[in-house]
Swiss-Prot record:
InterPro entries: NADH_DH_su5_C, NADHpl_OxRdtase_5_subgr, ND/Mrp_TM, NU5C-like, Proton_antipo_N
Keywords annotated in UniProt: Electron transport, Membrane, Mitochondrion, Mitochondrion inner membrane, NAD, Respiratory chain, Translocase, Transmembrane, Transmembrane helix, Transport, Ubiquinone
Cellular localisation: Mitochondrion inner membrane
Keyword presence, Nucleus: no
Membrane topology summary: Multi-pass membrane protein
EC number: 7.1.1.2
Catalytic activity: a ubiquinone + NADH + 5 H(+)(in) = a ubiquinol + NAD(+) + 4 H(+)(out)
Signal sequence residues: none
GO molecular function, one term: NADH dehydrogenase (ubiquinone) activity
Top-level lineage group: Eukaryota
Name the record gives this protein: NADH-ubiquinone oxidoreductase chain 5
Main location group: mitochondrion
Gene Ontology biological-process annotations: ATP synthesis coupled electron transport; electron transport coupled proton transport
Phylogenetic placement of the source organism: Eukaryota, Amoebozoa, Evosea, Eumycetozoa, Dictyostelia
């Protein structure tokens, strides 16, 4: 069951990708969707065994590689964290597959699309079931390359090409950090296996590594590189620029990327390595600050966006910030709780937005929408449920998961927790503001489309509606039904999946907070609803235009529109200098300049010139040509032998020095 659960998406991807043209589009797509549905059902069964029966399954399949002391085995680890993740991944992915059957119906390359979707899911499953860092990194890289292929699915679009490259390049910074973190893990622990590392971690909390002459705590240094990987993959502040550009892919890709797969990989990495990272207060503080600032940043940017998908994308970035700073405050169970509920209502929002875009002939600008509440009533109801869940409306999913993060953050009574809680409350207001702004501009007021567009507006088809209804039901009930399972005081399901200090019982503290603090999210919700209603409902004049006549409001507006100038600074300080260095210096001045002159082109030109001058001054015979050819061949042979001997001597020298180095301890 466990192996089948992992390989079913791979089987669906191979059949659809390699044999789709022979089997036909319809049959191959049905196979891919069927494999994903079976995977989701098997994940639910595994969740029953692991979560409700309170068991852990860990087994080794084979030895992957063995080089010296490095022994990497291919194994699968199904614990509470893994079972929650595979349920979320496969359920959301199966809904996206079903939705895409009609959404991509007219696309000529739909078999390739479904193959990519299934392979994307397989790599994410491989990542979360890994029992060692190397296997996790393999899944990590697979998710990255598949995101490139999916964002760039419509490869004839220039903007899609640029967005996919941007996503890959920025994620390479994160991959670089994780790669070096894994190298340091092996250097310190002599193993990459989670069970070994987490068992030894408490005994090396004082171990240091000499870095450029400074003694640095080993766990802090390892954690720093892991955090770089988390920041890149989960689009946290600094490496977030790829996230809104990823909207260039098809809308189902956005739902899969930003709900259950790629962006949650960073949060999963923090949760998986929590038995290691929790021993470094520095790393926990960094996670808290980065997560809180990302929440604030994404909220302010989302307020001024006009693209319906980009608004939802920035809300994803903001919610990921909640999860990250919850991890930094050791609220791991609250973080995975919010990750789970967020996956369902965020997938609902993206797929509802896809239904709107599909009905409006691919229009994404909210300023060109309006009046759709009567034309697309079911889509409106689903979008409303997703919006209410996102904003924390009482008794919906987001209400339980987001409020527990805010309450436990304030209950830490440290400055980091207070800082994160204050930003979280402010972001809760901003989230409500831009969510209802989206709802009002899209579904209310007078239609702002062309008449021919209005005439063609239609509700989504059955295959697109079924996932919306299922996700809407989950967005309403899953937070309430799973609250005790995730954050209940008596829940035993987490066992050793997470690490927390024994005195870190923040759930109890959050239950006795002041009433005013518990009501703050509700006040933020009320004001967040009233403000966009005041500015955008039944517009007779653009009230925002009058607002930004105020100099401070105007500067703030442009600061947010320019995305805090991150794109500008990254282009001016990083991209342009590197392009100048690579093209003007390395390419023109060196590759096509200096190296050509002292290399093949320069030598050939000099020889031709010399020989031409020699011919003009001397009589050349056939024997002279033969003599020169023989001399050239002998010269080439001599140079080759000489180079080989020099290289051989260097190798011998290194061998001798290495032998002496190994013998030195014995001599002493």
């Amino acid at each position: 069951m466990y192996i089948i659960n992992l390989i079913l998406p791979l089987i669906g991807s191979i059949i659809t990708g390699l044999f789709g043209h022979k089997l036909g589009n319809k049959l191959s797509i049905q196979i891919a969707v069927g494999c994903m549905m079976l995977t989701a059902l098997s994940s639910l069964y595994i969740g029953y065994e692991i979560l409700l029966c309170n068991s852990v399954v860990h087994f080794k399949l084979s030895t992957w590689m063995q080089v010296g002391s490095l022994n990497v085995e291919y194994g699968l680890l199904y614990d509470s964290l893994t079972s929650i993740m595979i349920i979320v991944i496969t359920c959301i992915s199966s809904m996206v597959h079903l939705y895409s059957m009609d959404y991509m119906k007219a696309d000529p390359h739909k078999t390739r699309f479904f193959s990519y979707l299934s392979l994307f899911t397989f790599f994410m499953m491989l990542l979360v079931t890994a029992d060692n860092f190397v296997q996790l990194f393999f899944g990590w890289e697979g998710v990255g390359i598949m995101s490139y292929l999916l964002i760039n699915f419509w490869y004839t679009r220039l903007q899609a090409n640029k967005s996919a490259l941007k996503a890959v390049i920025l994620n390479r910074f994160g991959d670089f950090g994780l790669f070096f973190g894994i190298l340091l893990v092996f250097l310190v622990f002599k193993s990459v296996d989670f069970s070994v590392i987490f068992t030894v971690a408490p005994f090396i909390t004082e171990y240091t590594i000499n870095l450029l002459g400074y003694e640095v705590n080993a766990i802090t240094l390892i954690g720093s590189f892991i955090v770089i990987g988390v920041v890149g993959k989960s689009a946290q502040l600094g490496l977030h620029m790829w996230l809104p550009d990823a909207m260039e892919g098809p809308t189902p890709v956005s739902a899969l990327l930003h709900a259950a797969t790629m962006v949650t990989a960073g949060v999963f990495l923090v949760l998986r390595t929590s038995p290691l990272l929790s021993y470094s207060i520095t790393i926990l503080n960094i996670l808290t600050i980065i997560g809180a600032l990302t929440t604030l940043f994404a909220t302010t940017i989302g307020i001024v966006q006009n693209d319906i998908k980009r608004v939802i994308a920035y809300s994803t970035c903001s919610q990921l910030g909640y999860m990250i700073f919850a991890c930094g405050l050791l609220n791991y169970n609250a973080s995975i709780y919010h990750l789970t509920t967020h996956a369902f209502f965020k997938a609902l929002l993206f797929l509802s937005a896809g239904s709107v875009i599909h009905g409006l002939n691919d229009e994404q600008d909210m300023r060109k929408m309006g009046g759709l509440v009567n034309l697309m009533p079911l889509t409106y109801q689903c979008m409303l449920i997703g919006t209410l869940a996102l904003t924390g409306f009482p008794f919906l999913s987001g209400y339980y998961s987001k409020d527990i993060i805010l309450e436990t953050s304030y209950a830490t009574y440290y400055w980091e927790g207070t800082f994160a809680a204050i930003i979280g409350y402010v972001a809760a207001f901003g989230t409500t503001f831009y969510s209802f702004r989206l709802l009002i501009l899209t579904f209310f007021n007078k239609p702002r489309m062309q008449y021919k567009t209005i005439a063609g507006v239609h509700e989504a088809s059955t295959n697109m509606v079924i996932p919306l209804v299922i996700l809407a039901i989950c967005s309403i009930f899953i937070g309430y039904l799973t609250k005790d399972l995730f954050v209940g005081l008596g829940t035993p399901i987490w066992n050793n999946s997470f690490f927390a200090y024994p005195y870190n019982n923040l759930i109890l503290e959050s239950e006795v907070l002041q009433r005013e603090l518990k009501l703050l999210p509700l006040f933020a919700f009320i004001y967040g609803v009233l403000t966009p209603v005041l500015f955008y409902f039944n517009l007779k004049e653009d009230r925002m235009v009058h607002l930004i006549k105020n100099p401070i409001a105007k500067e703030s507006y442009f600061f947010f529109v320019k995305k805090w100038y991150f794109d500008f600074l990254s282009r001016v300080l990083i991209a342009v200098p590197f392009f100048h260095l690579s093209y003007d210096v390395m390419n023109k001045d060196l590759d096509k300049g200096l190296w050509e002159q002292i290399g093949v082109t320069g030598v050939a030109t000099a020889l031709v010139n010399e020989f031409t001058e020699f011919k003009l001054n001397n009589e050349i015979t056939l024997s002279t040509y033969i003599s020169y050819i023989v001399q050239a061949i002998l010269l080439i042979i001599f140079v080759g032998i000489f180079s080989f001997m020099i290289g051989f001597l260097y190798v011998e020298l290194f061998v001798i020095l290495g032998a002496l180095y190994l013998c030195l301890p014995k001599i002493k």
